């Protein structure tokens, strides 16, 4: 069966494959798959949230997935240092009103200054996405090797997967990412022009 041409969500593909191969989904697997569905769909808010996603989520809950625990682990609490770094990232948000495009950046020295691990900042794209006047949000994160990773989110009909593909990245219509050895200024120029 060709799942990939009709499905952009890895966790949906895994779920279908488990079902097709009669693999019993235990509680641990259900928690992992539901975590993926929640994050892939932005808590069931992005345009890739379909009736099938809700059906799968319901079945995973029936198999023992713990929605409360998953939500608390992902969204319910933030380390104090990561929260103080969030305020710095908010200060750096730039809004291009003409393009309805908001962006911000996290530098390597931010991780050191705030004593935060890079993975503790994954939620920051959702902070940039909160800018009401934007339909596209970008968070650029400097990597240890000096390269940059970009996380893109969109509202409405903007396909951020097309933007990510400029840099060899990909993802979904509403949530995509990329890596680049170019400077943040170059990245922004390519996106804005």
Locate each region found by the language model:
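Short alpha-helices
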Residues: 1-56
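Hydrophobic helix-and-loop "lid/oligomerization" segment in the mid-to-C-terminal part
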Residues: 42-166, 171-192
């Amino acid at each position: 069966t060709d799942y990939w041409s009709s499905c952009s969500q890895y966790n949906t593909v895994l779920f279908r494959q488990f079902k097709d191969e009669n693999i019993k989904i235990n509680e641990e697997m259900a928690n992992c798959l539901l975590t993926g569905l929640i994050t892939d769909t932005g808590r069931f808010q992005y345009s890739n949230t379909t009736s099938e996603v809700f059906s799968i989520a319901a079945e995973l809950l029936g198999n023992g997935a713990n929605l409360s625990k998953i939500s608390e682990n992902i969204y319910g609490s933030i380390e104090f240092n990561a929260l103080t770094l969030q305020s710095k990232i908010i200060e750096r948000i730039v809004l291009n009103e003409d393009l309805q495009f908001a962006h911000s950046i996290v530098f390597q020295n931010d991780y050191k200054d705030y004593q935060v691990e890079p993975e503790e900042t994954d939620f920051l794209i959702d902070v940039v996405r909160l800018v009401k006047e934007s339909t596209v949000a970008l968070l650029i994160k400097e990597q240890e090797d000096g390269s940059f990773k970009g996380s893109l989110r969109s509202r409405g009909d903007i396909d951020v997967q097309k933007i990510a593909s400029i840099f060899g990245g990909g993802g979904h219509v509403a949530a995509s990412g990329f890596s680049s050895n170019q400077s943040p200024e170059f990245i922004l120029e390519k996106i804005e022009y």
